[in-house]
Amino acid sequence: MGMAIATDPRVAKVAFTGSTSVGIKIAQGIAGQGKALTLELGGKAANIVFEDAALDQAVEGVINGIFFNQGEVCCAGSRLLVQESIAEEFIARLKERMTTLRVGDPMDKNTDVGAINSR
């Protein structure tokens, strides 16, 4: 269905967010048709923390990066790279901060982590 819409001559622009393999198929399917194309494809967004970072702020950045919207965003910080010299301290702070996250109703503004769809 998606390819039928993307290749339809009445469609002037295709915007797709999803997997790299499907993005490649879409790009191949509309090649040569003169359509505008925007692809936001799967990847692994990394949080990188160096030893000169303000660690508490970096912890908050990591928490927001992975838990915002239950992690269901295309740019969720799904990888964490920490300079070796601060890794132990940073991970300890991150673990401590994670224990304070409030799990509950995603519609409650005070909830940090709500329900996650697994199907």
Which functions belong to the PLM regions below?
Residues 1-15:
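A structured beta-alpha segment of the ubiquitous adenosine-cofactor-binding alpha/beta core
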Residues 13, 19-119:
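ALDH superfamily catalytic-core signature
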